[in-house]
Amino acid sequence: MPNLEELWAYLNDKFREELTPVGYSTWIQTAKPVKLTKDKLEIEVPASLHKAYWEKNLVTKVVEGVYEFAQLEVDPVIMTKDELQPAPATDQRPAVEEDDQNLTFKAKTHLNPKYTFDHFVIGKGNQMAHAAALAVAEAPGTTYNPLFIYGGVGLGKTHLMQAIGNLVLGNNPAANIKYVTSENFANDFINSIQTKQQEQFRQEYRNVDLLLVDDIQFFGDKEATQEEFFHTFNTLYENMKQIVLTSDRLPNEIPKLQERLVSRFNKGLSVDVTPPDLETRIAILRNKADAEDLSIPDDTLSYIAGQIESNVRDLEGALVRVQAFSTMKNEDITTSLAADALKALKLDDRSGQLTIPQILNAVAKYFQLTVQDLKGKKRVKQIVIPRQIAMYLAREMTDNSLPKIGQEIGGKDHTTVIHAHEKIMASMTTDENLKAQVIELRNILKNRG
């Protein structure tokens, strides 16, 4: 049995890398581990809002992290302090066979019941993705196969993916549904090789009615895993079984992804999700407040929504922080209280607020050009390289989709943005002057204002 403190430190490091500073301070730093047994990890959180968020967004990552660290399959149990009860002595059970521990591909795959279409707030940034996901859920395997949903962190890709699974299961309880992250798939494949059970692995993955694979971009540097997934994909596609994939970028932008996989991922429909606009952010907060029975004025919701522009996770994290601050001070939630609660997050400094026009202005000023030069069609070197740098910075420092970046930088095609990003990345490895310019511009943009 692994040391609980060491395991928790490992999970903390993973969350610190994957979450924004706002998310990490709100959800992870306020939680603490209570007990670890062979099949259960108890985690204490301060309030019911934290519990709901953990159960909706973080338990799957805990399961993956514990398996990576200790090769244990556990069910995370999230409890508030009031709910926490001493675990009965009968929780201690004999260790399972080593072979059984390795058969991760035989473990049940749990869809989060809270990820439904009813709980999804539709806005301009996700309405096409929502419509496509709903169409797939209502008639799996017949249209948009595969469905490829891409966009930044915390924008609802996993929610939509699991909503498809939950609706399919609701319509057909006998449906065989498999939800995994790309890391799960890779680990299962490796374990099947080590235990000489590749045939069982293939039976598990190639006989499903619906395969949901999250964060497919992590396949990029795994050649053998890509080979296995290629054959899995082909089998399911030929049998008209539905495949849904998510990624933080388009298929042809994933580094080291085989061309034949890119081609297959592009067979269906690719839809993006972008950061929610103000109206959608307010609706998300109202939906969350109503679900948690929180009394909060509309003007306060508007204030919070105006402070958090990055993603839904940070938005919900801000609401939880305000609710906790209200409880601690024993005061009603007001705009003034919300401002005090969010002050420590230094929201005015976060890079998530950076816009493409700000990048264009900074790049134009730096290279003594005009914004119109960058948006124009002139192909002289003195303009082309700054234009490519602007596209590179927009891709690296904002959550905007490739089509959005291209549109705002002179109506360019998304493939032009991909080329510019790759060109600047490659050039920085050999051109020290260019690298210094990009670093200096990054610092200017980070320290703007």
Curated annotation (Swiss-Prot):
Domain of life assignment: Bacteria
Residues binding ATP, per UniProt: G154, G156, K157, T158
Database matches in PROSITE patterns: DNAA (PS01008)
One annotated GO molecular function: DNA replication origin binding
Pfam family, one: Bac_DnaA_C
Disulfide bonds: none
GO biological process: DNA replication initiation; regulation of DNA replication
Region (Domain III, AAA+ region): 110-326
Keyword check for Cytoplasm: yes
Stretches for region Domain IV, binds dsDNA: 327-449
Domain I, interacts with DnaA modulators: annotated span: 1-72
Compartments, as annotated in UniProt: Cytoplasm
Region (Domain II): 72-109
GO CC, one annotated term: cytoplasm
Alphabetical UniProt keywords: ATP-binding, Cytoplasm, DNA replication, DNA-binding, Lipid-binding, Nucleotide-binding
Major location category of this protein: cytoplasm
Function text: Plays an essential role in the initiation and regulation of chromosomal replication. ATP-DnaA binds to the origin of replication (oriC) to initiate formation of the DNA replication initiation complex once per cell cycle. Binds the DnaA box (a 9 base pair repeat at the origin) and separates the double-stranded (ds)DNA. Forms a right-handed helical filament on oriC DNA; dsDNA binds to the exterior of the filament while single-stranded (ss)DNA is stabiized in the filament's interior.
UniProt xrefs under HAMAP family: DnaA_bact (MF_00377)
Oligomer and partners: Oligomerizes as a right-handed, spiral filament on DNA at oriC.
Family as reported in the entry's similarity comment: Belongs to the DnaA family.
Comment text on domains: Domain I is involved in oligomerization and binding regulators, domain II is flexibile and of varying length in different bacteria, domain III forms the AAA+ region, while domain IV binds dsDNA.
NCBIfam families per the UniProt record, alphabetical: DnaA (TIGR00362)
Name of the protein: Chromosomal replication initiator protein DnaA
Organism expressing this protein natively: Lacticaseibacillus paracasei (strain ATCC 334 / BCRC 17002 / CCUG 31169 / CIP 107868 / KCTC 3260 / NRRL B-441) (Lactobacillus paracasei)
